[in-house]
Amino acid sequence: MIQNDIELQTTLERIAKFQQQVLHLRKVEVNPTNYRLSASGFLAEIDRMQLDVREYLTLHPSDLKKGE
């Protein structure tokens, strides 16, 4: 789970990089099956990271300090 704003920013940057990779695959992979196989891992990781971001943003900063 994301613990602070620095980790949040890092995760958001990582999501953007993974999205760019999927966009690149869409352009270069001509076989739809190969595209889906190649992109699925990136998309699953994007989903996981977005869930982490959502969980972090749901919490108020004081909630995070209680867990320390």
Go through the PLM ranges and name each one.
Residues 1-13:
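Short, charge/polar-rich alpha-helical segments
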